Every structure is written in C-alpha cells, then in structure tokens.
C-alpha cells in the first residue's frame, strides 16, 4: 500500500490496518517455520507496510499536537 493512500485514512483506521498486517505477518512467520510459505517477499512487503503506517501515525499525531500548541 502506498503512503499517499494511507495518508487519507484516519488514525483509528491506520491502527486497525496495522493490527491486520501484524496478524498477517504472524501467520506468515508460522508458514515459513512449517515450510509452507511460497512467497517470502510478502513478509518483507508486510513489514514495510507496517513501518509506513507507523510513520504516518507519528506524522499525524505530531501535526495535531503542533496545531493544539498554536491554539493555546
């Protein structure tokens, strides 16, 4: 998923998506351990998506905290 698409989501939606991706990564790790995983590249992609989501959540919280500081 691209960062531009993720920036349109709210923080709650991003956290929900992060939770889904972490669950998927957990399942992929089990498949890898059992030798069932066919597409190892998917694990790398999921990790990067999680990192993107966490970065955007941080950006949004920083922007909202800056906005509140200017109002006071």
Swiss-Prot record:
Coiled coil: none annotated. It comes from the Bacteria. GO terms for cellular component: cytosolic large ribosomal subunit. Transmembrane segments: none annotated. GO terms for molecular function: structural constituent of ribosome. The keyword Protein biosynthesis does not apply. It holds the Pfam family Ribosomal_L29. This is Large ribosomal subunit protein uL29. InterPro entries: Ribosomal_protein_uL29, Ribosomal_uL29, Ribosomal_uL29_sf. HAMAP family: Ribosomal_uL29 (MF_00374). One of its GO terms (biological process) is translation. It comes from Thermodesulfovibrio yellowstonii (strain ATCC 51303 / DSM 11347 / YP87). Belongs to the universal ribosomal protein uL29 family. Keywords: Ribonucleoprotein, Ribosomal protein. The keyword Transcription regulation does not apply.
């Amino acid at each position: 998923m691209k960062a531009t698409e993720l920036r349109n989501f709210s923080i709650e939606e991003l956290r929900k998506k992060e939770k889904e991706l972490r669950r998927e990564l957990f399942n992929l790790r089990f498949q890898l351990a059992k030798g069932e995983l066919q597409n190892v590249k998917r694990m790398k992609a999921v990790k990067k998506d999680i990192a993107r989501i966490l970065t955007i959540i941080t950006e949004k919280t920083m922007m909202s905290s800056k906005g509140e500081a200017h109002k006071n």
